[in-house]
């Protein structure tokens, strides 16, 4: 199973990519349940380089690494691994930013759900979640 979501925003790919990656802590809905740390979650970061971390920082200063950046090509694509501690394997998230007239089309794929029964079961929830996350992003940009 591969989760696919797409949405369009009326901003340039350069602006959209920068806000998505460098300002993720301003728009990601941590306090709305989209966090591994729950109530402890304070901030979220993407380190802008291949091999960098996608991680949450908690109120006590500890961190949880969601995954590692596997592609970072401004303003076109960012990708990272994603692993819940209960899963059998990692998944991968890839986000592309394509020029679309005077705006940008954002295409997200989250793949690798076939690795185990726990992951297959949780895939639908993640599909719904990515829709909410992208809507939150577009409302903040």
Language-model features, listed with the residues they occupy:
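Aromatic-glycine hotspot motif
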Residues: 1-14, 57, 99-107, 139
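Hydrophobic ligand-binding cavity/cleft-lining segments
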Residues: 1-42
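Conserved strand-loop elements at the edges of beta-sheets that form or border functional pockets
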Residues: 9-11, 48, 71
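Hydrophobic pocket/interface hotspot
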Residues: 16-20, 54, 69, 78-80, ...
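A conserved amphipathic terminal alpha-helix motif
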Residues: 24, 111-141
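Hydrophobic-ligand binding "helix-grip"
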Residues: 45, 55-102, 111-114
